[in-house]
Amino acid sequence: MKTPADTGFAFPDWAYKPESSPGSRQIQLWHFILELLRKEEYQGVIAWQGDYGEFVIKDPDEVARLWGVRKCKPQMNYDKLSRALRYYYNKRILHKTKGKRFTYKFNFNKLVLVNYPFIDMGLAGGAVPQSAPPVPSGGSHFRFPPSTPSEVLSPTEDPRSPPACSSSSSSLFSAVVARRLGRGSVSDCSDGTSELEEPLGEDPRARPPGPPELGAFRGPPLARLPHDPGVFRVYPRPRGGPEPLSPFPVSPLAGPGSLLPPQLSPALPMTPTHLAYTPSPTLSPMYPSGGGGPSGSGGGSHFSFSPEDMKRYLQAHTQSVYNYHLSPRAFLHYPGLVVPQPQRPDKCPLPPMAPETPPVPSSASSSSSSSSSPFKFKLQPPPLGRRQRAAGEKAPGGTDKSSGGSGSGGLAEGAGAVAPPPPPPQIKVEPISEGESEEVEVTDISDEDEEDGEVFKTPRAPPAPPKPEPGEAPGVAQCMPLKLRFKRRWSEDCRLEGGGCLSGGPEDEGEDKKVRGDVGPGESGGPLTPRRVSSDLQHATAQLSLEHRDS
């Protein structure tokens, strides 16, 4: 089993996967990538590069093989690994760098800092890489507070030491204090402590060289809430040696040798990181609290770990999940600044729901509309439709007026009722027997031959009723077979050209009779002028043909 000292990561139990548990899915791929980025032996395989949070996979096959070994999947390859990395795109954990092969970038600004592991931070002797993640501080630490405040840890037990080494309690506690002083009075908070237990502006050189007393803390260490080894992973990693491969820079506070702020990573923002970005106003050094711990000793910025403070602390952690889009490095929690709680969005939609419900019955009953008139939206009536509203207003108005005797509403309704009946006449005119139509048309054609078209002047007398007939004639013509329609048109064209097709005169007349018979007698009152012209042309061509035969 891999020891915590080998990894150097402060994973909790749910995020740490030892190699001795095959098939376990507790470790995530991006946790594993952070592990590889921190180890010196894998610098030729994967390394930080380029912009802030960016890393390049130099040997994709080797990274996939290592991931397969870790997950007990020997068939792992880079294709499967890249699909797993693409899964993190929507999670806003990392994304692919465009234009660069095998290059990805962690979204440390968008990451929910509660969800990614805190990389153990030591004294980096070398230069900080440009792509290093942000400096973790009071609010951005990977912390898991104790589940119950009843778990009490003795102040002499070193939470960062193995349980076997906790026998000499006083020496271990002194070592903890000395180690914290050596890294600039900053705690990684994985041991359940807060970095604000120590004064921010105090010069570490003013402290005695020996083991510091308990009075060096602003509050008694007995007030610290404990942590369970099941909740926090205990790491006995020494803090004295330099860690040039750590992606985090040196402590954000002043080191033992100077009072000036340290040199930060060039990828960090310009906001003052020496001020603790904490999840609760009580943790902020600007919080004007009068008392310190439960014993009353200490300055104003002491986090006493009282039940009230812990309640606010846990509430702030749950709130950070809802406000994950806010960067904890760029959002200072001031005492006067009120951050909306997670339950407020549930209350916000309630006020608009009240005015939305009354307008629905307002259209049905006048009493409800009068009661809800002050809450009615101006833009709500138009979506109902102007025609529907007009019809709704006319319907009750017409009934009232008809009962009163005015009759104006009845006329409007009558006009609306008269409009639809026009289609029935078209249906009644269509069914006409062919025999009757042929007989009628035969007599008409015989009259044309005898009286030279005189008979067509008498039917023109009634022009009033045939007005709807022009709409009927095309409808009847559409019902006519295409063959007869084109034959009739061809015969008329031939007649207009001057008798070029008179060789089959009787047959054409017979066909024309059939076509005219299909049209029906009702058409005689409609298109009279073209039929008269065609008859005149027919007689003229007949006379010309007789003259040619005689000659």
From Swiss-Prot:
Residue positions where Phosphoserine is found in the record: S20, S24, S185, S190, S327, S433, S437, S446, S534, S535, S551
Regions of compositional bias (Acidic residues) in chain numbering: 433-453
Bias type Polar residues, positions: 535-544
Bias (Pro residues) ranges: 239-250, 348-361
Keywords for the protein's UniProt record, in alphabetical order: DNA-binding, Isopeptide bond, Nucleus, Phosphoprotein, Repressor, Transcription, Transcription regulation, Ubl conjugation
Entry PTM: Phosphorylated by multiple kinases including MAPK1/ERK2 at THR-529. Phosphorylation regulates the activity of ERF.
DNA-binding region: 27-107
Residue(s) carrying Phosphothreonine: T3, T7, T443, T529
GO cellular component term, pick one: nucleus
Residue ranges with Gly residues bias: 289-301, 404-413
Location relative to the cell: Nucleus
UniProt-annotated stretches for the region Disordered: 130-169, 184-304, 342-476, 495-551
Keyword DNA damage: no
Function field: Potent transcriptional repressor that binds to the H1 element of the Ets2 promoter. May regulate other genes involved in cellular proliferation. Required for extraembryonic ectoderm differentiation, ectoplacental cone cavity closure, and chorioallantoic attachment. May be important for regulating trophoblast stem cell differentiation.
Similarity field: Belongs to the ETS family.
Protein name stated in the entry: ETS domain-containing transcription factor ERF
Taxonomic lineage from the root: Eukaryota, Metazoa, Chordata, Craniata, Vertebrata
